Design a protein with these regions (language model features):
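Beta-strand-rich domain onsets/edges
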Residues: 1-19, 25
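Extracytosolic secretory-pathway proteins
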Residues: 43-45, 51, 68, 72, ...
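Short flexible loop/turn segments that cap and initiate beta-strands
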Residues: 17-18, 23-60
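Extended, solvent-exposed segments with strong compositional bias
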Residues: 57-101
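Extended acidic/polar, glycine-enriched regions
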Residues: 85-185
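Inter-heme linker and motif-flanking segments adjacent to c-type heme-binding CXXCH motifs
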Residues: 123-130, 150-183, 197-420
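Domain-length functional cores that host ligand/cofactor binding and catalytic or interaction surfaces
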Residues: 184-193
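Short, solvent-exposed loop/turn segments enriched in Ser/Thr/Gly
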Residues: 15-20, 111-115
Length: 420
């Protein structure tokens, strides 16, 4: 899910700018990914075409990023409709920086806007394939729970000015900065101008802790609740919130944030341990007590957005997990190993292409429409399960197969059934 801080006059954590990726596969005995002589376009559903009507980002974009995108265009030039470009590195078509927001032109909130994706022959214009998917996007960052203020947008979502101002005042008082004065003069700072953040390829100033480490490390010392409820104070994951972004099969069987990411204190310790030697890391970690292990030293250091929970920590050999699975402290070695980036054994198919995106693994259940996340498996296989599940190899291969080409144990039958 793409978060948008929605606090543009005061600071920006993340700007509008989500991405779509597409794989086009020629079906047959030996399916073949197509990378040339095609044009793939995307278009958002009606009501989401004018994000600049609902955000102050375009008034401040030049201040933060030295760019002045046109209204309803993102920092990379893409709009809410446009054309994909082929990415040789990921071997997929990509449209990055789409400035989508959860606010609609008719005054409703929906953090799951649908996009229609159409592939055409570049010479003849013939439609080769068409499908629908969504971009999960939310402005429901719960800073107000501690910093005060209402929700900015219709008491549903977004960061109010009162909330953002309190954050800056506290930052200035704790760290001797002048962020409030800068913002009041119309020159607010991008958080990543000081704090490194691999999420947007920001290197920071090299002196401060990375952004994710700073935020989790500080707040873990103050948040009074435990377990997944601690995550839901800030992230749009709480079951009573407007977003409820944990939609996948993991959530449906009762797993929570903690099963993969650890408790708030454990999560923070893992990030702070990567920064050992920095004075601020030492200060933040010294009062944190681990939950899942005996000592802080037992928690493996990790870099945000690079070392994440490894799917195979629970799905050993792609088999059924244990009754109480946990991927905490079993981190991926590099970004390429993260679920969102990982490929199958052939190296040509991404895991998410068949199994669904992060936090919405098939079969998913969307709070705004139960089928909304499952449109592609329903389109291609008439079930909400992973595309090709239950030995459905003929979806791409046009015939049954006996070889487990993509990963081990892929030919076993799905063990759960879900009504859609």
């Amino acid at each position: 899910m793409h978060f948008v801080s929605d606090s543009d006059p005061w600071f920006v954590i993340l700007p509008p700018g989500a991405g779509l990726e597409a794989l086009l596969i020629r079906r047959g005995g030996t399916p073949e990914p197509i990378s040339e002589k095609v044009v793939i376009n995307y278009r958002v559903e009606p009501g989401f075409e004018s994000p600049s009507r609902h955000s102050r980002f375009w008034d401040y974009a030049e201040n933060y990023f030295d760019r002045r995108p046109d209204p309803d265009r993102g920092l990379l030039g893409n709009g809410t409709s446009g054309e994909f470009a082929y990415n040789d590195k990921t071997m997929s078509f990509a449209a990055d920086g789409i400035p989508i927001l959860p606010y609609t032109d008719v005054g409703t909130f929906n953090p799951y806007p649908l996009f229609t994706i159409t592939a055409k022959d570049s010479a003849s214009g013939k439609v080769l394939a068409s499908t629908k998917t969504l971009i999960p996007v939310s402005t429901e960052m719960g800073c107000r729970n501690c910093h005060g203020g209402p929700w900015r947008w219709k008491n549903i979502s977004g960061m109010a000015d009162d909330t953002a101002r309190d954050i800056l005042r506290r930052h200035d008082r704790a760290h001797g900065t002048d962020l409030m004065a800068r913002a009041e003069k119309g020159k607010p700072r991008l958080c990543q101008s000081c704090h490194a953040d691999p999420a947007i390829n920001a290197v920071g100033d090299g002196k401060r802790l990375p952004l994710s480490t700073s935020i989790h490390g500080l707040h873990a010392n103050y948040i009074p609740v435990k377990g997944a409820d601690a995550c839901g104070l800030c992230h749009p994951s709480h079951k009573s919130g407007a977003t409820r972004y944990a939609r996948g099969v993991h959530a449906s069987v009762g797993l929570s944030c903690v099963n993969c990411h650890g408790s708030m204190s454990d999560h923070a310790i893992s990030l702070l341990r990567f920064e050992e030697g920095k004075r601020s890391a030492t200060s933040l970690i010294k009062h944190l007590r681990p939950v899942a292990v005996q000592a802080r030293a037992d928690i493996k250091p990790r870099k945000p957005w690079i070392n994440g929970p490894d799917c195979l920590a629970c799905h050993v050999d792609f088999k059924k997990p244990s009754d109480n699975p946990s991927a905490f402290n079993k981190w991926t070695g590099e970004a390429a190993d993260l679920y969102k980036n990982r490929t199958d054994d052939t190296g040509s198919l991404r895991c998410v292409a068949c199994h669904g995106t992060v936090h919405a693994e098939y079969p998913a259940r969307n709070p705004y429409n139960a089928r909304r996340d499952n449109l592609q498996p329903l389109q291609y296989s008439k079930t909400p399960y992973a595309i090709g599940a239950n030995r459905g190899c003929e979806i791409c291969h046009r015939e049954a197969k006996r070889d487990e080409v993509h990963h081990r144990n892929m030919l076993r039958m799905v063990r759960r059934t879900v009504r859609q």
